[in-house]
Amino acid sequence: MSHLMSLPIVLLKEGTDTAQGRSQIIRNINACQIIVDIVKTTLGPRGMDKLIYTERDVTITNDGATVMNLLNISHPAASILVDIAKSQDDEVGDGTTSVVVVAGELLNEAKGLLNDGIEPNMIIDGFRNACNVAINKLNELSLNFSNKNEEEKRSILLKCAQTALNSKLVSNHKEFFGELVVNAVYKLGDNLDKSNIGIKKVTGGSCLDTQLIYGVAFKKTFSYAGFEQQPKKFINPKILLLNVELELKAEKENAEVRIENPNEYNSIVQAEWDIIFKKLNLIKDCGANIVLSKLPIGDIATQFFADHDIFCAGRVEDADLKRTANATGALVQTSLFNLNDDVLGTCGVFEEVQIGNERYNIFKECLKTKSVTIILRGGAKQFIEEVERSINDAIMIVLRCITNSEIVPGAGSIEMQLSKYLRIYSRSICNKEQIVLFSFAKALESIPRHLSHNAGYDSTDILNKLRKKHSEQTSDIWYGVDCMEGDIINAYDNCIFEVTKIKRNVIYSATEAACLILSIDETIKNPSSAAGTQRSPYS
């Protein structure tokens, strides 16, 4: 009877792959390190770009979130790094590479602690304690500029935008694009809704040909014969927005009409013409000068509008139609009955202009909602797409800077100051958690270390200089990495600023990701799910 008690009990399906224990935690950490090694070289103003190609497209970028998404990572633990990069991008728009690098460095430090026999739960508790201490110190060191005058505020916003653009492909023109971004955000007024900033791309010309248009602009849609005769400029026009099709439709599949004589066929055709012309006359009678529709506007309607000096555009993208509605005050109509002045919008000036090889419809002086459109120019599609990502990051930074009004000097200076504080704080801890806090402090130094390494300088030498400078009991606590000269620099005096919320989010998200990975002591792989998935090189 006793031998029956020792028989193994099988609960999992045959072929199920399981791995557990401390060795599994280390395997998960090693998988994450592979991802971090790919991304970390993109950090900083001298960071390198990545060329990622698929069957359909080629992408050149150094944006951390974009790189992580395009890697198509399938490893369950490493995919956590993808999630934190995406959440960082959604939340604040920048710091995506930093959050992955810090998380990777925390895991690397944890790996050494695990090998030294420290329990995972103690490491997790220590990391969370260190995170709280670091964030409290960060809040204490933050510089609030809400009491500055408008000129000083604008200058700070400009510096924050330029700092965000420093590590981008357009870093040589950061003054131009920084000014453009700040002007775009300022035009929004109190309604800081990013959806009111449109970005369009036109291939050709120099990136310095990029335009900021105070209004709504979108590319000319497909048009039929007769469009050339329509007026292309209006002053104070009445604008009608539709979600209605204005063209003769072919009969549906297997449709059938039974007639007794040929005259009945003519009456059916005439009825179709009467329906379309009734719709067109309703539009003409409401007094609209411009008609935009999400659905097609056919050749008959195009010629009708041309005869009555009305501009029309069909197949307008939904996002452009919504922005036009918000900017002009027009209401999108799904029916042509009861059209009146209440549903019509207006703007100061409408015109169709040539930009590069494209025609653009532009609505200016929109009083209902302040909107802007940035039209990007550049020689290659991949270049323009990377500029768009850079502009988006800078816009998010400026928006967050306005709403939070808190900044810290960058260039790795804040990380060095927090690292110094954590080292001092760790000495007050009497148990093994002291080692964990010390490791957290060391992990924060990964930002200035990678900044200097990616710039091609001796990171050990620069880190030693920074540690010495920050250990001195002076008010000069804002020394960071000078990526251009290979030395240290006062980030505050040189106006290198970053939004406090970015740094706060980086520390918090990186800590939570590291703690989550450290808390996984067993991985179970279902054989049925494994059979249907193709193995990724990063799994």
Curated annotation (Swiss-Prot):
It comes from the Eukaryota. Its main location: cytoplasm. The keyword Transcription does not apply. GO terms for cellular component: chaperonin-containing T-complex. The keyword Amino-acid biosynthesis does not apply. Gene3D superfamilies: GroEL, GroEL-like equatorial domain, TCP-1-like chaperonin intermediate domain. One of its GO terms (molecular function) is unfolded protein binding. Keywords: ATP-binding, Chaperone, Cytoplasm, Nucleotide-binding. Pfam families: Cpn60_TCP1 (PF00118). GO terms for biological process: protein folding. SUPFAM superfamilies: GroEL apical domain-like (SSF52029), GroEL equatorial domain-like (SSF48592), GroEL-intermediate domain like (SSF54849). It is found in: Cytoplasm. Belongs to the TCP-1 chaperonin family. PANTHER family: CHAPERONIN. Molecular chaperone; assists the folding of proteins upon ATP hydrolysis. Known to play a role, in vitro, in the folding of actin and tubulin. Heterooligomeric complex of about 850 to 900 kDa that forms two stacked rings, 12 to 16 nm in diameter. This is T-complex protein 1 subunit eta. It comes from Plasmodium falciparum (isolate 3D7). The lineage of its organism: Eukaryota, Sar, Alveolata, Apicomplexa, Aconoidasida.
